[in-house]
Amino acid sequence: YVATRTRFDKVNKIDGNNHLILLCKNETGYKNLAKLVSAAFIEGFYSKPRVDKQLLEQYHEGLICLSACLAGEIPQAILSGDYERAKASALWYRDLFGEGNYYIELQDHGLEEDNIVLPQLIKLARETGIPMAATNDSHYLRKEDAKMQAILLCIQTGKTMQDADRMEFQTDEFYVKTTDEMYDLFAMVPDACANTQIIADQCNFDFEFGNTKIPYYKAPGGMDNQAFFEK
C-alpha cells in the first residue's frame, strides 16, 4: 500500500492508502522490496502497512511497477473525475521507475467502475506512451468457485449468505483466466496481454535456498552474545 500523504501521517479519515504492484527483476529489486516492506510495517503501519513516495524514490531500483487495480492511485483519480491528476501521477511513476519498468494495469471484471476507468486508462497510456499490462484480480481458481468464495467471506466477516450487508464480489469474474480469455477480453489492446510475458521474462531473481542468513546483533557493553543471553 502507498500512503495518501506520507507514511508518518496517520489521521483518521484523511490518511488512507492506495494499492501498488511491485515485482522483483533481480537481487537488487528483492533487497529493495524487503526494505520497503519492513519500513511499511515498522514506520508506516496505519490499518495497513504503507510505504510512501519518499521510500519509493529511495528503493525503486531493480523493481517493475504496475499501477494496480481500481484501488490504485491512478484509477482512484479517474473515478474522482480528475484525469489530469491521474496522468501526472502516471508520469511521476514512469519517470521514477524508468522506461520499461512501469506499466498501466488494465482490468475488466464487468464492474461499473471498470466501464469508467478502463477507457480512460487506455487513453492515458496512449497519450503518454506508457505500456499497458492486462491482469485479472484472481481470488479463486475457477469461475464456478465464486459461490465458495462468497461463503468464505461470510465466515471471515461473521455474516450469512442471507445478510443484505454482507461483503461480496459484484461479479463472478475474479478467477484465474486462461490466455485465450484474456486476449478475448482485451482484444482492443492485444499488446497489453503480450506485455505480461515481457514482464515475466524480466523477473529473473532466484532465491538462494539452504543458506541461512541470520542478522548479527552485537550485545551491549562489549559482552559476548552468549554471556548476555545467560545474564
Show where each model-derived region lies.
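Phosphodiester-processing cores and adjacent nucleic acid-binding clamps
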Residues: 1-231
